[in-house]
């Protein structure tokens, strides 16, 4: 496939005209959800007396997408769990779930808690599938040097794969095993986990009916908000007249919104999703122009225009770039209007992040033209990490968030802290693993995969395996940094981890953004199909 022959939009004007079937019931659903929230709150408070019950309830609320309604209660419960020794430390399920939830919420818990579950020869002693699943998920919150967690993943994966061959394994549990082997719980997109887990929870014997009903209502209400946002961003996108003026780019506005919703799914982040969706779409145009369509001279003209950020620079650009450049400037200005006078300063950081992205892309063009191969993967990532766009998109989501994200937070982000680099590295390595064959055939710059092949004389398959190992190392970097206290809001670190999850999802088997038919069904589940209440 030629890199400039991307398939057309799969959605077109669908969300401009779409009327969700649940919209007329919005008032009733909201009223019912408010009643159920308080009922579930009482259940959560009652669970404080028993650690296992508390852990089970917290993980259930998280998987159903309800935890944001109970942030204070959950934080308080987990502080109690962290300080209490009143639990069975010989119960692997409890130990694993406790470890998972505490680390996920930023508590430093030692992985030594798992050594007691090994025999004298250092092998894990466990054959219960539910315990294996929980241990496997817990182990993925590992950092560097935690050998016991590395070993736990190897052991549990082997055991879980074997369990799938057991005809006596309950079907529900087998489905959970298959899903977990594909993507461990910590790396799943939270909103998609809710979609997948609601029907599973509905079949569990110990389900709480109030929680189940609330989860369904909560999703359907969120879906209505997403559809309103999709109408807005689709109308915004149509003004670019992509089909006529930019037919060579990836026309993916719905997929952009899907990506942003995967990272920031809570209703209160509506403006954040809209701004980040627009920025992702604009970054996609920039990438396709500079990477696959423009001549070197044209790409450098566009880069210089973005560095200067002046309207009159459009006069120096070729026709197909001119309208895009002016629309880019107009969009950033309109974001400032939406943010209001007290937060409009944030658009400065959108511009600065875009400039960093363009510098990285310019360096890659230079490599391509000179047939230059970076000497190390680190050298490659220094330039290709920023150009992948993941961090710029994450930062654009912060622009639309509340006042807890301060000017100091944005200044810190502009220094590209190590947490940011771990996100960029994960996104770049995943992107290269998924798309390297297509891009090399299209004459792109050397990817990290190709770089490794040339450095070590390996095959592409061998290089891809090594890049996957480096990706795991970057996840360990991220987890280590996530657990390190900083003066900045925890929301920043949490959102950066969420964006790493979206990269993992979009590039799991192939480039799901470019070849978006691979994610079309999931997009429909998120935006089109309401969950039945009965």
From Swiss-Prot:
<dbReference type="InterPro" id="IPR001906">
    <property type="entry name" value="Terpene_synth_N"/>
</dbReference>
<dbReference type="GO" id="GO:0010333">
    <property type="term" value="F:terpene synthase activity"/>
</dbReference>
<dbReference type="GO" id="GO:0000287">
    <property type="term" value="F:magnesium ion binding"/>
</dbReference>
<feature type="short sequence motif" description="DDXXD motif">
    <location>
        <begin position="287"/>
        <end position="291"/>
    </location>
</feature>
<feature type="binding site">
    <location>
        <position position="287"/>
    </location>
    <ligand>
        <name>Mg(2+) 1</name>
    </ligand>
</feature>
<keyword id="KW-0611">Plant defense</keyword>
<dbReference type="InterPro" id="IPR008930">
    <property type="entry name" value="Terpenoid_cyclase/PrenylTrfase"/>
</dbReference>
<feature type="binding site">
    <location>
        <position position="439"/>
    </location>
    <ligand>
        <name>Mg(2+) 3</name>
    </ligand>
</feature>
<dbReference type="GO" id="GO:0006952">
    <property type="term" value="P:defense response"/>
</dbReference>
<comment type="pathway">
    <text>Secondary metabolite biosynthesis; terpenoid biosynthesis.</text>
</comment>
<keyword id="KW-0464">Manganese</keyword>
<keyword id="KW-0460">Magnesium</keyword>
<keyword id="KW-0963">Cytoplasm</keyword>
<dbReference type="InterPro" id="IPR036965">
    <property type="entry name" value="Terpene_synth_N_sf"/>
</dbReference>
<dbReference type="InterPro" id="IPR044814">
    <property type="entry name" value="Terpene_cyclase_plant_C1"/>
</dbReference>
<feature type="binding site">
    <location>
        <position position="431"/>
    </location>
    <ligand>
        <name>Mg(2+) 3</name>
    </ligand>
</feature>
<dbReference type="InterPro" id="IPR034741">
    <property type="entry name" value="Terpene_cyclase-like_1_C"/>
</dbReference>
<dbReference type="InterPro" id="IPR005630">
    <property type="entry name" value="Terpene_synthase_metal-bd"/>
</dbReference>
<comment type="function">
    <text>Sesquiterpene cyclase catalyzing the production of beta-farnesene and alpha-bergamotene in equal amounts from farnesyl diphosphate. Involved in indirect defense by producing volatile signals attracting natural enemies of herbivores.</text>
</comment>
<keyword id="KW-0456">Lyase</keyword>
<dbReference type="GO" id="GO:0005737">
    <property type="term" value="C:cytoplasm"/>
</dbReference>
<feature type="binding site">
    <location>
        <position position="287"/>
    </location>
    <ligand>
        <name>Mg(2+) 2</name>
    </ligand>
</feature>
<comment type="similarity">
    <text>Belongs to the terpene synthase family.</text>
</comment>
<dbReference type="GO" id="GO:0016102">
    <property type="term" value="P:diterpenoid biosynthetic process"/>
</dbReference>
<dbReference type="Pfam" id="PF01397">
    <property type="entry name" value="Terpene_synth"/>
</dbReference>
<protein>
    <recommendedName>
        <fullName>(E)-beta-farnesene synthase</fullName>
        <ecNumber>4.2.3.47</ecNumber>
    </recommendedName>
</protein>
<dbReference type="InterPro" id="IPR008949">
    <property type="entry name" value="Isoprenoid_synthase_dom_sf"/>
</dbReference>
<feature type="binding site">
    <location>
        <position position="291"/>
    </location>
    <ligand>
        <name>Mg(2+) 2</name>
    </ligand>
</feature>
<feature type="binding site">
    <location>
        <position position="435"/>
    </location>
    <ligand>
        <name>Mg(2+) 3</name>
    </ligand>
</feature>
<dbReference type="Pfam" id="PF03936">
    <property type="entry name" value="Terpene_synth_C"/>
</dbReference>
<dbReference type="InterPro" id="IPR050148">
    <property type="entry name" value="Terpene_synthase-like"/>
</dbReference>
<feature type="binding site">
    <location>
        <position position="291"/>
    </location>
    <ligand>
        <name>Mg(2+) 1</name>
    </ligand>
</feature>
<keyword id="KW-0479">Metal-binding</keyword>
């Amino acid at each position: 496939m030629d890199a400039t022959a991307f398939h057309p939009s799969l959605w077109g004007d669908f969300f401009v005209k779409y009327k969700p079937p649940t919209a007329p019931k919005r008032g009733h659903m909201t009223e019912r959800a408010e009643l159920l929230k308080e009922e579930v709150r009482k259940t959560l408070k009652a669970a404080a007396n028993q650690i296992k019950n508390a852990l089970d309830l917290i993980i259930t609320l998280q998987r159903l997408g309800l935890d944001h309604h109970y942030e204070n209660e959950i934080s308080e419960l987990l502080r109690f769990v962290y300080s209490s020794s009143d639990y069975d430390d010989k119960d692997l399920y409890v130990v694993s779930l406790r470890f998972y939830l505490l680390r996920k919420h930023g508590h430093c818990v030692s992985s030594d808690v798992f050594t007691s579950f090994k025999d004298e020869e250092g092998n894990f002693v466990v054959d219960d599938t539910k315990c294996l699943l929980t241990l496997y998920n817990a182990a993925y919150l590992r950092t560097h040097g935690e050998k016991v967690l590395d070993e736990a993943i190897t052991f549990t994966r082997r055991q879980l794969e074997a369990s799938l061959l057991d005809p006596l394994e309950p079907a529900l549990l087998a489905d959970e095993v298959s899903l977990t082997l594909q993507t461990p719980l910590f790396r799943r997109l939270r909103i998609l986990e809710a979609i997948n887990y609601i029907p599973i929870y509905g079949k569990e014997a110990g389900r709480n009916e109030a929680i189940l009903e609330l989860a369904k209502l909560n999703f359907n209400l969120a879906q209505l908000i997403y559809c309103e946002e999709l109408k807005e961003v689709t109308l915004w996108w149509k003004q670019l007249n992509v089909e006529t003026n930019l037919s060579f780019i990836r026309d993916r506005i719905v997929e952009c919104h899907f990506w942003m919703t995967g990272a920031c799914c809570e209703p209160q982040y509506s403006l954040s999703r809209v701004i980040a969706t627009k920025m992702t779409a604009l970054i996609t145009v920039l990438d396709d122009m500079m990477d696959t369509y423009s001549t070197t001279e044209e790409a450098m003209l566009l880069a210089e225009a973005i560095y200067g950020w002046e309207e009159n620079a459009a006069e120096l650009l070729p026709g197909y770039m001119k309208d895009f450049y002016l629309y880019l400037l107009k969009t950033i200005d309109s974001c400032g209007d939406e943010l209001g006078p007290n937060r409009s300063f944030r658009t400065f950081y959108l511009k600065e992040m875009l400039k960093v992205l363009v510098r990285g892309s310019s360096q890659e063009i230079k490599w391509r033209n000179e047939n230059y191969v970076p000497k190390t993967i680190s050298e490659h990532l220094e330039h290709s990490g920023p150009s992948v766009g993941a961090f710029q998109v994450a930062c654009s989501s912060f622009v639309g968030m509340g006042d807890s994200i301060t000017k100091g937070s944005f200044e810190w982000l502009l220094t590209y802290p190590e947490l940011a680099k771990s996100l960029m590295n994960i996104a770049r390595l995943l992107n290269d693993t998924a798309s390297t064959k297509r891009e090399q055939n299209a004459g792109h710059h050397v990817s990290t995969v190709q770089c490794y092949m040339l450095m070590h004389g390996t095959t592409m398959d061998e290089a891809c395996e090594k890049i996957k190992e480096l990706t795991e190392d970057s996840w360990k970097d991220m987890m280590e940094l996530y657990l390190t206290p900083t003066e900045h809001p925890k929301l920043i670190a949490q959102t950066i981890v969420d964006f790493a999850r979206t990269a993992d999802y979009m590039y799991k088997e192939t480039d799901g953004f470019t070849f978006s038919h691979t994610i079309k069904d999931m997009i429909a589940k998120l935006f089109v199909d309401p969950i039945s209440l009965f």
